[in-house]
Amino acid sequence: MLKSFCILSVFMVLFLAKFPDLCSGEEISPLKIVVRNSEYLNNPCNGVTCPSGYRCSIVDKQCIKKEK
């Protein structure tokens, strides 16, 4: 009985270490992924703000000069 409890405890610790969201008490939601994707689409240049006269290109993933 004690041996099986120890084995179960080890597996539970390994499981929680693999999925840290489960031990934080937060719900796992697919909306987090959507938020991350929308943040990426709003600024695909890895968080870099483009200088004045330039815009961030989704295709090139870099700042390019705005066309007039």
Curated annotation (Swiss-Prot):
Entry keyword set: Disulfide bond, Ion channel impairing toxin, Secreted, Signal, Toxin
Mutagenesis or variant effect for residue 61 to A: 2-fold decrease in potentiator activity
Protein name (record): Tau-scoloptoxin(04)-Ssm1b
Entry annotated with the keyword Signal: yes
Keyword Secreted among record annotations: yes
Positions of the propeptide segment: 26-36
Phenotype for residue 60 to A: 15-fold decrease in potentiator activity
Molecular function GO terms recorded: ion channel regulator activity; toxin activity
Entry comment describing in which tissues the protein is expressed: Expressed by the venom gland.
Provenance organism: Scolopendra mutilans (Chinese red-headed centipede)
Family: Belongs to the scoloptoxin-04 family.
UniProt region (Highly charged C-terminal region, binds to TRPV1 channel), positions on chain: 55-67
Signal peptide (UniProt feature, chain positions): 1-25
Intrachain disulfide bonds: 45-56, 50-63
Subcellular location: Secreted
